[in-house]
């Protein structure tokens, strides 16, 4: 009996020792939590913030996230402006994998979009064209191309056709006679300004989008004649002349116009190959990995080359969208006093350029960077203003405040207070998740010609 009691005590001591060792092991043990943030279609969402204990991490480009060496119990909470998540949070005290499904916050975007489109419809003249700003008598080719894209994106095809019809009727009197449509014209039809390759390219981009949705041969001649003129501007070095001035002299080559033309002329042939070769040799800083707007100048870079370059060229690096802090700034809006953060057209950073900020939203959406696209869309929303002429019609001014455009040129009076086409259109494209440069994006560019991948 005594031996049994002694054995019992020895066994208990052994078990207690083992228990103590096990508890010590559990205290020292660490674990990993990981998972993914996806949208309702199961696609990964980038740059979603996740608070995990006292740490903050961000989801990768594919939506994945992971944190290791955790102890005790931690709460995992995803956060992003404009989104709700299911589950709203999760708790882990051991290795755990969890997927958060993000849904856009229930903002009545449809009503907002309808009020923007209503403004476009209200300002359209009987001849089909729209003034560039409310109460303006100036009609811009680029702005009307954007308006045609607005109507196409929202299924208002007859409104888009009214714009195309105007130019279709002037193929002989303008396009084939002078080469290219004029940059500006007044409400009575009087033309002025240069005939820019970029503006004409955007009319072709609008046609490409329309013809991708509507089966018609009505605008085949307009499309082919625009393309022929754009191709005719290619120099022997592969670059494109910027167009023709009002005095019929040649406009120097500009990067933005060459991007526009590359996007507008569909397919891939020697035109595109030579154009890429020119950009590589003359308009690309391989050290910075950026397209150059003005070689050797103080204003070397321009914002739209980041966004349009990314949306136009296949496999263009996402890093170009990250290298835009040189333009980021915050201003107090003239129209309503709101503080708004966005991008300037250049390094002066004296305005928030709403059109350019909208272009960045579209580029961020293409890059699946939902955090930044949602953030800057919300910033732009602060400057939605009501029409002074039409009820239930809203839009955005060109800029937050008066300052300079690209370079040192001053903005016009009213650029910070009057609704304009360009900013309103690009904001709407962001609302609709519509990329006008997506049609024809996959053109089979050979890897050897993609200089940005060198």
Please describe what each predicted stretch is.
Residues 64-75, 81, 94:
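Short Pro-Gly-centered beta-turn/loop motif in secreted/extracellular proteins
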Residues 107-142, 176-186, 192-198, 212, ...:
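Extended ligand-binding clefts on enzyme/binding-domain cores
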Residues 44, 54-66:
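Short, acidic Ser/Thr/Gly-rich low-complexity loop/linker segments typical of extracellular
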Residues 30-46:
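Structural motif
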Residues 145-157, 167, 307, 313, ...:
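Alpha-helical support elements that line or immediately flank enzyme active sites
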Residues 8, 12-35, 99-111:
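Bacterial Sec-dependent N-terminal signal peptides
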Residues 48-52, 76:
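Hydrophobic beta-strand segments
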Residues 77-89:
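A short, solvent-exposed loop/turn motif at the edges and junctions
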